[in-house]
């Protein structure tokens, strides 16, 4: 209260006289008096607002490197240290991933393709190597199964489908979406696990019709299809595990928005120079 009185009459009487009259020290008053905001503090406030917005748009997936790339692309002059400091000071944390269970049904007598990929996930152009797999999401209506096809060149999801049953038709619909979208040339490697959906006669017949080279993982080796496993871990951490799903349709709409509205066009990958799959393909064209 005394400090506020000094501030009110400062200028009309000397600060020293007011302090002596009210029995307070000059140092105490200076420590209490609000200091003007510096330009750097103002800049921090602007940067923090952008960080909060990108944290929301990225569903909490961007740590310091990706966040810095995003802000720099927007024209902000920021570095990794400043972004990291502001995120730490304001409790802005990254969503962590968890291990996923396998859904492979390999207890069958169907033919299995050789492992052409052999854990070489690199490609020099789109439509050289594709990989597919199936995962599952729990809803209050029961399981929802998700099949995806990913282009290993850009990590882009080029085909996907959902169903309440993990049958071959689910995998076939994801493949047909990918083929219709990309029109891959003959000889594209198509890699999956040994699941019965992918080993089925109908699925293998489609692969031959479209000119794919079929490739399958070794028995029980999840690392042979690590790229798709990584996508599922990311999807579940950034979307699936963050809320309960009451009906399958609700989850399906959210998957559509995540894949087509965020993951493909916006989500940055360190392996792609912190570019999104769509941007990486566009700049490489």
Go through each PLM region and give its residues.
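Charged DNA-binding/catalytic regions of mobile-element recombinases
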Residues: 1-285
